């Protein structure tokens, strides 16, 4: 496919707005992609994930009965941009840059991956089978898709993720894991004027806990903990009997994830007669670099050189992706293989037209020759 034809295809995808929480909108694009894949002779199956998110689309070049471990490619069709974003931030081309909500993250990369799979299928290359998953809820944690991603990973020799390239076109070989914390303090209500001494202020307790939680951040170890939301109380004339916070933690290794989780679950109240209710869990496991992923990177770098660009690895990133799931399962995973650009999740989000041709050539060569 020529660069103008590929660009036109990506523009069609961008013109269909797909916020994560709008199941119908995501389904509209999923059906368009499905029809395109079927027309190219690929199998393409939609799986409904309930009413809250759109369907998951699996596109594959497997022949009937082919159960060999293959290449799992991960992409997502949802974006962080709400409906109406396109009217405020219209699709437009300014020189080498293509602006539009969700183009860089990650409709361009997803379209490039699909086009590469169509190229490999058309050539009838004797390569590993490829399963390409278009996830509908990646931007909100992939809670509905996770089990399907992990199930596909069980039959994968490699995992390639079409998330946007990092600065300089670099790829991703490690990501932090993300955990969540919900903490409630339960005290005792009282009239703030008549019986203040009988009250047990849950907000006061929560203030102590916020300081303790923020103190767990350790930049040297790569651990961060952020209290992002607090709420409690009913009025200034009532000693509050309940207060709650929501926080997240990010960790570079599974060992640190377990350590932080243990510390969170061991938190104790600082105020007499106040009880804490703690719920902490890991939403995405850490994506750790391994010898096997280094070997995959080396292979990818050879194919990038053939396509005319140098593929370097970016430092570990605090942002997570669906690659966290595959890497945690021991599947050699390479991420950030999408197009070059900048401004993900912002109004100035854009990708570079000049990166489309080289990235398509790279993806096609990589899918064709990985063994």
Identify the role of each PLM range:
Residues 70-72, 98, 105, 157-161, ...:
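Short glycine-aspartate micro-motif
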């Amino acid at each position: 496919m020529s660069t103008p034809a590929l660009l036109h295809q990506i523009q069609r995808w961008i013109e269909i707005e797909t916020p994560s929480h709008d199941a119908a909108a995501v389904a509209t694009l999923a059906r368009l992609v499905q029809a395109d894949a079927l027309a190219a002779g690929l199998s393409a199956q939609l799986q409904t994930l309930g009413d809250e998110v759109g369907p998951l689309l699996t596109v594959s070049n497997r022949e009937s009965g082919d159960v060999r471990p293959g290449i799992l490619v991960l992409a997502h069709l949802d974006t962080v941009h709400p409906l109406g974003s396109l009217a405020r931030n219209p699709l437009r081309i300014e020189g080498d840059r293509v602006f539009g909500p969700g183009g860089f993250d990650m409709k361009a990369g997803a379209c490039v991956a699909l086009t590469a799979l169509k190229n490999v299928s058309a050539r009838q290359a004797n390569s590993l089978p490829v399963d390409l998953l278009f996830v509908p809820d990646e931007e909100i944690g992939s809670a509905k898709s996770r089990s399907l991603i992990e199930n596909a990973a069980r039959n994968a020799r490699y995992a390639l993720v079409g998330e946007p390239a990092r600065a300089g076109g670099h790829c991703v070989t490690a990501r932090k894991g993300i955990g969540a914390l919900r903490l409630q303090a339960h005290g005792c209500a009282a009239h703030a004027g008549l019986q203040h001494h009988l009250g047990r202020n849950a907000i006061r307790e929560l203030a102590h806990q916020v300081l303790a939680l923020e103190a767990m951040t350790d930049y040297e170890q790569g651990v961060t903990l952020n209290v992002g939301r607090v709420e409690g109380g009913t009025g200034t004339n009532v000693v509050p009997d309940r207060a709650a916070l929501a926080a997240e933690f990010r960790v570079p290794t599974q060992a640190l994830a377990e350590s932080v989780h243990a510390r969170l679950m061991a938190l104790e109240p600082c105020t007499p007669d106040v009880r804490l209710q703690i719920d902490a869990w890991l939403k995405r496991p850490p994506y750790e670099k391994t010898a096997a992923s280094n070997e995959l990177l080396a292979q990818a770098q050879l194919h990038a050189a053939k396509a005319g660009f140098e593929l370097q690895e970016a430092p570990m990133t605090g942002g997570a992706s669906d690659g966290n799931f595959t890497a945690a399962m021991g599947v050699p995973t390479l991420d950030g293989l999408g197009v070059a650009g900048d401004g993900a999740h912002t109004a100035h989000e854009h990708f570079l037209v000049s990166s489309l041709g080289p990235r398509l050539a790279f993806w096609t060569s990589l899918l064709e020759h990985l063994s």
